[in-house]
Amino acid sequence: MIKIITGRQSDPLQTEIIGRAARNYLAQPGKDTFIIVPNHIKFNTEVAAIGKVAQLQGREETSVKNLHVLSFSRLAWFFFKKADLLMPESLDDAAATMILEQIIDKRRDELLLFKNSHANSGMIKQVYSTILQVHTGQLDLGNLLERAADPAVALDLDNETRDKLHDLDLIYQDFLEIVSEKHFATKDELNIQLNQLLASRPDLVSQASFYVTDFSHFSIQEKMTMQLLAAFASEMTFAFKTADGSVIEPAAGEYDYVVQKTIKDLTGYFSAHDFAWEREKIASPASPARDLNQAWQGQGQPDLNNLQLVKADSRYAEAYFVARTIYDEVALKGCQYRDFLVLAPNLQEYETYLAPILRQNQIPFFDDLQQQMKYHPLVLLLENLGKLLQQAGDTPALLSIMKTRLLIPDWYLEGDAEAGEAAYLRDIDQLENFALAHGIKYSLWQKPLKDFTKAQVIALDQEQYQKWLDRLDKLRDFFVSKISRLARQLKSEKDSMTAVKLFFDFLVKNGVSARLEAWRLKASESGDLQQAQQPEQCWNLLLSLLKDYLLVNPENFAWADFFKMLTAAFSQANFATIPASLDAVTLSEYGMVQTSGYKQVFIIGAANGSLPQINDQPNFLTTENLASLADFFDQDAYLEDSQQLRNLDQEYQFGNALALASDRVYISYPVINSNNDLLDPSIYYKRLLKLVNGREYRQRDLPDIAEKDRTEFARQLLLFLTSPRASLGYLAYAEENSAQSPLVAKLVELSRQYEEEKAEEIAEGMAYDNNPQDISEDLAERLYGKDLLSSVSQLESYYQNSFEYFLNYGLRLRPRAENELNAIQSGNYFHRTFELLLKEMQKKNIEIDKLSELDLELLLKQVRSEILQEPLYQQFLRDPFNEYLFKVFDKTTSKVAQSYRRKQQENKMRATYGELAFGPAEKLAGLVLPLKKFAGQRKISLRGKIDRVDLFNGDQHVLGQLIDYKSSDHSFNLARFASGVDLQMIAYLDVLEKNRDLLAGGRQFDLLGAFYQYVTRKLNSVNSSSTGALFDSKLQLKENLLGGEDKLKLSGVFVSEPAWYQEVDKALEKKATSSVYRGLKLNKSGGFGKKDNFFSQDEMRELLEYVEALIEDAASEILSGQIALNPFRQGNNTGLAFSDYKDIFYFDQQLPTNSYRDLPNLKKADLLALVEKRLRQRE
């Protein structure tokens, strides 16, 4: 007898079917009773079915023998076993992909679409999906193409569809042939073979009863299974949910079109074959769920008190609303955790919110979101082994393998294995540091680590760490030798069986399988059953894939295809999940079939774009292609447009979700996403909002501390409270930000009684101040020494942000060294080039202005060759791209040098010293300043290097100027100097002044200035609106700007003595504008006029005194232990812009305790007034 039971979506059809099946089982315990459900709910349905049997027996627990709860795939396995048939080997998607790639390559010349194009993995996946549809649909593509080509048939296909079918037919036939030869079964083959078995062996089901529920649609083969069971089974019962429980003629666009079409197809078959069947509509009792379902379908507008719409500030607020509501319902109303279901269109978006918040509230939950295998250490090992065979010595791949902890050398595990593993991980970290610092990659991994230490770029390069380096080298050799040996073996091996055995032996002999087993046991012993399953599931899948590969490709081993198959298979694989407890909240994806019996359901993430879930994923045969093929299909052989079916079923599926709760439904959306982009509610949310007359609850991230009414504030606060542990943060926030409230104080006191330690942590967190505390003078002395030895750049960093100075030069924290040619290293290369060029000219007693352009280039070539032989630059040159960059740098230095050569023909200043070092133990004395704060008992010694010092021996005096090379355009900024952020130019002038006798040989020594030399190849823009444009407003060419020569002029701070510049700059004899110094122009009276970067000799002396005061102030504060988070700011430039320590600072200008130290805009007069004031204080 066949029975079709129908009801509304809100009716307990699943419970009804389970009850009937349980009673049938008890009435006929010797016969098989089957409940067929979607695979997703098989476990919960089985629990419910056994529970129902126990209830009918009057027991708390029971066992069953012939009651089976199965999905379609499990049904196939059941009958294969019962018929004593060999179960076919299931073809993995990755193996199928490999077969299809082989077919396409073989047939390429015969194919139309793939003849001249590469079939990527996405396209192969689409083709495979379509092949499965064709196979399941029993479609004869060859016959279809013949019919389309027959002039007598009044049907035609468009060219795109015809070409796709042509290629598909060729690929499909070859695919079936190969699969048949290899004795594989595709993932749809199980249903096909099941149907063949049922058709030939009706005795298998003749005494069985079948109950089918929770389907709204069947695939072609599933529908055939239902037809066969209806024909041969003793009893067949279907349960379907329609709009109002009635069965009507299906019409596309109707609310329940898909399920009505399914019923129509079945009943039509039954009638056509004269099967006895009857239809039963179960009673639909009045309930809140029915009212909501009717309202959703537009059948009346009842009072929807069971529906709560929630507008949340964020996804965090949504998740907290879920947790708080569940907590309250369980704690105050006696609900159980299994009464709650949480659905999300994209559950992955809420993984970082829901799970932590539920755990914090001690709410047990089962997340049925499938966890991907591709992040498991075994999968990472396999994937990166493939990368190393593709490119030997791939550093990220090699380090990833080391970090999997699957290949730990034995010598680490002797004795205490846990301590040994910790030591291994420390060594891996150090080896990674060493490799990144020295740019070790590819073939360089074959070299001993000591070969790289000459560069001296990391602490491990030093002799004192040789033993540690030897240990790291042993570790390097362990991995490199083993992986290289495996690579050689696999690349040379042609026999698949031998190659797979070599690969498997590599894993086993190196302890991978033993390691996985150890992880499994450890997780099992700790009670984490989910984690305990993962190593075994990964290993079993690997074994299955190895077997598949040998079946697909038993002879000609291709290592690239082998690893490609493994990677592809694991990237699509998921871990099987099991609930840790039967009493747990269920988290699931919206759109998946769910069991009944939930009291309250949350649908979160109901934002526009998420609901409805319109599917537009690309398929090989598009909706348009399938529409043009529709006329060629018949009742028993066709292709379904599954995408269109899903889209047509959206409102029905949402109705299913609404009907899952017997008591209450919550629907929420966040107003912003994780990127702080504004979100609109879903059209479904808006539709329901109208039904409840705009009744909407607003879930805030935090209680509203602006609420003045104490009663209302208390009410709001209570809505955030759950367990003492989870509530403490909100209570601390309320206590901190609201007026004194007896309620808040009492709640805080109660929470502290349960969570004293957590309360202290939160109190500390609320009082957290990211501003550092000063250290004692004793500790400062231990960090810096009794006297401070420092450089100008270090003191500048102190004035830029003193906390950074402490981290860098006090604690000596450094970012990890990496072998990259960054801006600092490029600047060093420029400096080194000009330094050696000057030394070479002095060695050969050559004046640069006497050299020809070619001679200078030859000299530069010699210098560059010498530089690139240095260990550091040899290390950089291991990267081919760096070799290119050095050539670019060389063009820049050539341009600057040639410009200098030309200008020296008009300038009498001569480069005398390059990279002139000063300070203790140097020929040139540094600044040594006693510190008044310490009564002169302590001092600061300044050391450093001046890029270049130029001298001119005149009749009356010696003039000196210093040059500082810069990779970006610089000018002397008064505010930055006044604040100490830019000390360099004036401090270096002070050093020259202090060494006047040495530099001038006892003669009169005068400072000309300190200048920046911009090292650049930049040109001026043709159409720029600035003064640097090549053409003026009358479109006249500015010849002085050609080639960007103006950018190479010296700029900086000038001593305002026109006569001195006329002494050294010959161009000033002919014109008022200097060709060497930017901005230097004589006026009619022979002076410079008023300019902020020109200072008289007396003013310059004041600046030199002022810079000493700044140096002394900084040193005194450093040695006193003063530390402050006080970054400067000037326009868009801040003391944090290029900092390596931002993650330590946590600087946030929104915090009341964090603020920038803004530099004022200063004119020359302002600066001099400031200088005079400070110097008076110093006296």
UniProtKB/Swiss-Prot annotation:
It holds the Pfam family ADDB_N. Disulfide bonds: none annotated. One of its GO terms (molecular function) is double-stranded DNA binding. InterPro entries: ADDB_N, DNA_helicase_suRexB, P-loop_NTPase, PDDEXK_AddAB-type, Restrct_endonuc-II-like. Keywords: ATP-binding, DNA damage, DNA repair, DNA-binding, Exonuclease, Helicase, Hydrolase, Nuclease, Nucleotide-binding. Its EC number is 3.1.-.-. Gene3D superfamilies: P-loop containing nucleotide triphosphate hydrolases (3.40.50.300). The keyword Cell inner membrane does not apply. GO terms for biological process: double-strand break repair via homologous recombination. Its cofactor is Mg(2+). Despite having helicase-like domains, this subunit does not have helicase activity. Heterodimer of AddA and RexB. Belongs to the helicase family. AddB/RexB type 2 subfamily. The heterodimer acts as both an ATP-dependent DNA helicase and an ATP-dependent, dual-direction single-stranded exonuclease. Recognizes the chi site generating a DNA molecule suitable for the initiation of homologous recombination. This subunit has 5' -> 3' nuclease activity but not helicase activity. This is ATP-dependent helicase/deoxyribonuclease subunit B. The lineage of its organism: Bacteria, Bacillati, Bacillota, Bacilli, Lactobacillales.
